């Protein structure tokens, strides 16, 4: 038996994010579905006030986890152009697609051909025209530079060592002046022997050395262990 929705309201801080309240008192975040009637990863669809919303699961999306954990700055709005490195099968990009809308654009880079096919099936083939899929290796931005114009945000979520370096290298190519970077640090992908806090410091220092001001850092527990989200901007 499904739990009835009693209210949907805009999130107090984040554009394009909504808070859904259920009759049992629980609340979940959601985005307004750009392609009504279609799911991407089995998420709950919620109808309210003539609109359809997609529940945004923090156990499936690190950006959702950061928002639920109190992230204050999400530099994504309607019309934002973004480079997303490590698009995987499209869970988080799909919600960003909802937020940026038809005027926005998400260049989505994924390395694995198998996962890339899933991304195509779940997002592009279902009519999300603001998503540009790119099969490529985020370590080598010159390989896909001809596909991408300047972007407002570079976001990275890859299971690679040197995550901050990869992010900064891509930002050097594509980030507009005044733009933001969003770094998901996966500590265990960098050094399984070091404490996660030390790995976080190491990656943050890399961004600082590349000229970035760190605006915010949020840890993602309990949704993801040994993960953190960092928001930064070029000085």
Swiss-Prot record:
Molecular-function GO term, any one? rRNA methyltransferase activity
Q: Which UniProt keywords apply?
A: Methyltransferase, RNA-binding, rRNA processing, Transferase, tRNA processing
The UniProt record lists the EC number as 2.1.1.-
Mind telling me which InterPro entries this protein's record contains? Fibrillarin, Fibrillarin_CS, SAM-dependent_MTases_sf
Entry keyword Glycosyltransferase: no
- Lineage, top-rank taxon, reads Archaea
Q: List the residue ranges forming a coiled coil, or say none.
A: none
Gene3D superfamilies according to UniProt = Phosphorylase Kinase, domain 1 (3.30.200.20), Vaccinia Virus protein VP39 (3.40.50.150)
**Enzyme group, top EC level?**
transferase
Keyword RNA-binding present in the record's keywords: the answer is yes
Q: SUPFAM superfamilies under this entry?
A: S-adenosyl-L-methionine-dependent methyltransferases
**Pfam families associated with the record:** Fibrillarin (PF01269)
Q: Which cysteines are joined by disulfide bonds?
A: none
Instruction: Give GO terms for biological process.
Output: box C/D sno(s)RNA 3'-end processing; tRNA processing
Q: Which positions are annotated as binding S-adenosyl-L-methionine?
A: 91-92, 110-111, 137-138, 157-160
Question: What's the subunit arrangement here?
Answer: Interacts with nop5. Component of box C/D small ribonucleoprotein (sRNP) particles that contain rpl7ae, FlpA and nop5, plus a guide RNA.
NCBIfam families xrefs: PRK04266.1-1, PRK04266.1-2, PRK04266.1-3
Tell me, in a sentence or two, what this protein's role is.
Involved in pre-rRNA and tRNA processing. Utilizes the methyl donor S-adenosyl-L-methionine to catalyze the site-specific 2'-hydroxyl methylation of ribose moieties in rRNA and tRNA. Site specificity is provided by a guide RNA that base pairs with the substrate. Methylation occurs at a characteristic distance from the sequence involved in base pairing with the guide RNA.
The similarity comment for this entry is:
Belongs to the methyltransferase superfamily. Fibrillarin family.
Entry protein name: Fibrillarin-like rRNA/tRNA 2'-O-methyltransferase
Q: Which organism is it from?
A: Pyrobaculum arsenaticum (strain DSM 13514 / JCM 11321 / PZ6)
Please spell out the taxonomic lineage of the organism that makes this protein. Archaea, Thermoproteota, Thermoprotei, Thermoproteales, Thermoproteaceae
């Amino acid at each position: 038996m499904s739990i009835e929705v009693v209210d949907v309201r805009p999130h107090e801080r984040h554009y394009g994010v909504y808070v859904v309240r259920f009759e049992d008192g629980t609340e979940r975040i959601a985005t307004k579905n750009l392609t009504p009637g279609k799911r991407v990863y089995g998420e709950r669809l919620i109808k309210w006030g003539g609109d359809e919303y997609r529940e945004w699961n923090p156990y499936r999306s690190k950006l959702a986890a950061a928002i639920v954990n109190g992230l204050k700055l999400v530099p994504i709005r309607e019309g934002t152009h973004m480079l997303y490195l490590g698009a995987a099968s499209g869970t988080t990009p799909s919600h960003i697609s909802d937020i940026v809308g038809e005027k926005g654009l998400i260049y989505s880079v994924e390395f694995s051909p198998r996962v890339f096919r899933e991304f195509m099936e779940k997002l592009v083939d279902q009519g999300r025209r603001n998503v540009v899929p790119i099969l490529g290796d985020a370590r080598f931005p010159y390989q896909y530079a001809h596909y991408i114009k300047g972007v407002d945000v570079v976001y990275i979520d890859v299971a690679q060592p040197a995550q901050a370096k990869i992010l900064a290298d891509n930002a050097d190519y594509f980030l507009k002046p005044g733009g933001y970077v969003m770094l998901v640090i996966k500590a265990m992908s960098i050094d399984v022997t070091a404490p996660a806090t030390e790995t976080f410091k190491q990656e943050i220092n890399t961004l600082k050395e590349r000229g970035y001001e760190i605006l915010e850092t949020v840890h993602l527990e309990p949704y993801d262990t040994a993960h953190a989200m960092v928001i930064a901007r070029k000085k």
